[in-house]
């Protein structure tokens, strides 16, 4: 039995059903779960942390990433491109992915996430070059090394350039190949138990890079195995025009006809929904992963988050891939989301606390998890803490629930705890040799890009 006790926490932001913020509270964790929250708990533990100056929050939950893109960030040739041209250029790099690239880029990306308070990462991996090996296995290995909670996906593409899609032939597969490997990945890696450290979703890339048959079969398979469905949707006007030209209908109607609505489905981006479509999402419980930094960089537009929240559309927060974000900090995403919607919606904009809830409870809902996203007894012991004595936080004690949005935290957090295990201490990863990972990843990245 492993135990952790954090004593006398300055402010504990629970994000629970009562939105409680507790002062001078203790939190006791046992075998990965929260067993007690209170004051002056008379309990011994394997490790005791003094929380007397700490702001404590539920671990952040990232609902959309492309970890393999860590090795293609800050590339000058794509800095001023919009989505379709950006993708066509980068596919020429991504077609060289292998297990080493996936393991090291995943260690880097998830390590960066964890250093900034993220305890659960969903990754949308859809590029499977022929003879590239077990890419999801490499990603699972990286997550285990770090100690982060991972939600993988068996993504896919079956339409190459010759079929009217965007990717080259070398990274697409047949529907039969994709379905067979999706079953393999679910049966090998998916754990549906409470507190699971690894789950798997079925996640075709996007309606402009996969066939209707693949989308239809993916929905059937996911429901047969009781796993979730994810894809990109309504990210750009180019996508909307592409679907209108090819199918004669808008993207969401197309997906609805193929079985892609429901509380087991969430879409990345969701920028270009009209009023009727927003109401449809709300009625069906279909979710949206909000990726503000990526949307700004690729000039994709601004998602209608205030309207979504008002209607009851499930919304979570996400960093998106490191090639369109150039980083993996959900803390940064949180503050950008707060500021972006202040600019566009003023009094209707989400508060700093609303965005925190989006990145915790909201994100957990998208992933179908009621065991993470809040600090309450019986939930997973996933949390992070920030020392309130930091220079940049002077004078910020009045509203601990909103401060991550209104003021922001730009450096690593002081502690991250996943499943009751300390994974970040004083801003540094403790489960891996951070300097060694960075050195190996940089060397591999240089070799990878040199072969393009």
Label each region the model flagged.
Residues 73-124, 129-149, 180-194, 442-451:
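Alpha-helical scaffold segments that flank or form the walls of functional sites
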Residues 257-264, 306-390, 406-408:
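His/Asp/Glu-enriched, well-ordered alpha-helical/loop segment
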Residues 131-270, 276:
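Metal-coordinating catalytic core of metallo-dependent amide/deamination hydrolases
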């Amino acid at each position: 039995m492993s135990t952790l006790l954090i004593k006398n926490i300055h402010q504990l932001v629970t994000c629970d059903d009562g939105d409680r913020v507790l002062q001078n509270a203790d939190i006791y964790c046992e075998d990965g779960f929260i067993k007690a929250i209170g004051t002056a708990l008379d309990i011994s533990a394997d490790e005791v942390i003094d929380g007397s100056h700490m702001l404590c929050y539920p671990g952040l939950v990232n609902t959309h990433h492309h970890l393999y893109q860590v090795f293609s960030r800050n590339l000058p040739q794509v800095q001023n491109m919009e989505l379709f041209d950006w993708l066509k250029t980068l596919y020429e790099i991504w077609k060289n992915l292998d297990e080493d690239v996936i393991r090291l880029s995943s260690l880097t990306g998830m390590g960066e996430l964890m250093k900034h308070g993220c305890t659960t990462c969903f990754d949308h991996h859809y590029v499977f070059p022929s003879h590239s090996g077990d890419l999801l296995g490499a990603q699972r290995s990286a997550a285990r090394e770090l100690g982060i909670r991972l939600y993988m996906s068996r993504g896919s593409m079956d339409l190459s350039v010759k079929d009217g899609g965007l990717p080259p032939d070398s990274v697409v597969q047949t529907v039969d190949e994709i379905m067979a490997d999706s079953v393999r990945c679910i049966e090998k890696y998916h754990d549906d138990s409470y507190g699971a450290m690894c789950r798997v979703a079925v996640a075709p890339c996007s309606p402009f890079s996969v066939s209707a048959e693949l989308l239809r079969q993916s929905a059937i398979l996911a429901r047969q195995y009781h796993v979730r469905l994810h894809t990109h949707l309504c990210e750009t006007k180019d996508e909307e025009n592409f679907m209108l030209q090819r199918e004669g209908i808008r993207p969401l109607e197309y997906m609805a006809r193929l079985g892609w609505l429901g509380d087991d489905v969430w879409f990345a981006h969701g920028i270009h929904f009209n009023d009727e479509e927003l109401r449809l999402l709300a009625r069906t419980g279909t979710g949206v992963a909000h990726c503000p930094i990526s949307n700004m960089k690729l000039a994709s537009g601004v998602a209608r988050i205030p309207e979504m929240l008002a209607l009851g559309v499930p919304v979570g927060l996400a960093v998106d891939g490191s090639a369109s974000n150039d980083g993996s900090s959900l803390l940064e995403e949180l503050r950008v989301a707060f500021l972006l919607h202040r600019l566009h919606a003023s009094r209707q904009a989400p508060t700093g606390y609303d965005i925190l809830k989006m990145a915790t409870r909201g994100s957990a809902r998208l992933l179908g998890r009621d065991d993470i996203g809040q600090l309450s007894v019986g939930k997973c012991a996933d949390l992070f803490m920030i020392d309130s004595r930091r220079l940049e936080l002077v004078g910020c004690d009045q509203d601990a629930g909103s401060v991550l949005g209104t003021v922001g935290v730009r450096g690593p957090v002081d502690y991250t705890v996943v499943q009751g295990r300390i994974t970040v201490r004083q801003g540094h990863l403790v489960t891996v040799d951070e300097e060694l990972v960075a050195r190996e990843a940089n060397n591999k990245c240089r070799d990878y890009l040199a072969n393009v």
